[in-house]
Amino acid sequence: MEKIITTKDVHLYYGSKEALKGITLDFPDKGIHALIGPSGCGKSTYLRTLNRMNDMIENVKIEGEFKFKNQNIYDEKIDLVELRKKIGMVFQQPNPFPFSIYDNVTYGLRMAGIKDKRILDEKVETSLKQAAIWEEVKDNLNKNALALSGGQQQRICIARVLAVAPEVILLDEPTSALDPISTEKIEEMLLTLRDNYTCIMVTHNMQQASRISDTTSFFLSGNLVESNKTKKIFLNPDKEQTADYLSGKFG
């Protein structure tokens, strides 16, 4: 199966503290890929290396090989804006911009110089439909996105990412701040995206990982313990540490 992102021997240091200890992990094109492990294990830190979000943190040193479709993600000449369009990010806390739903979804398109209202209108409708929120907001696109519920705000943020045509969507615990109904809506929406996008999701919710992901990778203390098809990880893991974590012995 074709790999869209490959990482090899990844080390990351916060000052002198080593947070990632030689991670080698690849992601096949399309599907949902879960990163699991206890708090502080390095899964979110690793996720943020994939579109260079850790560049914003002072005193961070990153080593290893990172490739997106055989392009070096850490090439000095790479256009970070373009990279983050292709590898979008959805955060734990919904973070819509403080303006209308319409302007939130079209923000990236406008920044790219697209001004044709017909194109913008089409992108708004398509992206909101993909994010499973069109029916809830279609008659109120001028409403301030901050006035929406947390679950709706998160889906607006996902629509904003989708509008700029990413190939990979990184999701850092996208439902942990949401109620069960909102969580279910986002899970259902992600399942509809899996055939067209590569979704890489950090989650503390074991049931969520087992329900919707195709592959699962288990992190512990900055190490990658194992990675495999989700069914294999949950039913017959190779490593005792994985079995112990999934059975609730620690974490």
Swiss-Prot record:
InterPro entries assigned: AAA+_ATPase (IPR003593), ABC_transporter-like_ATP-bd (IPR003439), ABC_transporter-like_CS (IPR017871), P-loop_NTPase (IPR027417), PstB-like (IPR005670)
Reaction catalysis annotation: phosphate(out) + ATP + H2O = ADP + 2 phosphate(in) + H(+)
Chief location: membrane
Topology in the lipid bilayer: Peripheral membrane protein
Pfam families reported for this sequence: ABC_tran
Residues that hold ATP according to the record: 37-44
Record's keyword terms, sorted: ATP-binding, Cell membrane, Membrane, Nucleotide-binding, Phosphate transport, Translocase, Transport
GO molecular function terms attached to this record: ATP binding; ATP hydrolysis activity; ATPase-coupled phosphate ion transmembrane transporter activity
E.C. designation(s): 7.3.2.1
GO CC field: plasma membrane
The organism's place on the tree of life at top rank: Bacteria
Gene Ontology biological-process annotations: phosphate ion transmembrane transport
Location in the cell: Cell membrane
Residue span(s) of domain ABC transporter: 5-246
Quaternary assembly: The complex is composed of two ATP-binding proteins (PstB), two transmembrane proteins (PstC and PstA) and a solute-binding protein (PstS).
Family according to the record: Belongs to the ABC transporter superfamily. Phosphate importer (TC 3.A.1.7) family.
Function (record text): Part of the ABC transporter complex PstSACB involved in phosphate import. Responsible for energy coupling to the transport system.
Protein name: Phosphate import ATP-binding protein PstB 2
Organism of derivation: Ligilactobacillus salivarius (strain UCC118)
